[in-house]
Amino acid sequence: STLPYEITRSLYESSHYAFWLCECRYCGTPWLEYFKEFIGWLDGDDKMYTSWMPLVEFELAEISRNFPQERGRESIPELQKYFGRRRTLVLDPKNSYHWDQPGINPLHLAVTG
């Protein structure tokens, strides 16, 4: 199933990481979406996660101010920091949705490579 939201703006996109600003089609709540692919070098089974975190007004303003346009890879840690603040909705590699607690989402791992 798909979630009722629209991507309003790309903040960073690559083949293994992506961040987008989104908006709920029903209520207009802004969300920060984060995609991360963990590469399975040994078995080729890449694990892909997508996570969404609702944004409050000051966070949306801060992101809009700090990211007036899409930026490069150096922006990943700056955008990742938002996901440690509150629970996030996660779509895991098993195509299952669940809410995670702050700090335990696999997407919070540091950038490597």
Question: Predicted segment positions?
Answer:
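Short recognition patches in nucleic-acid-associated and regulatory proteins
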Residues: 1-21, 32-61
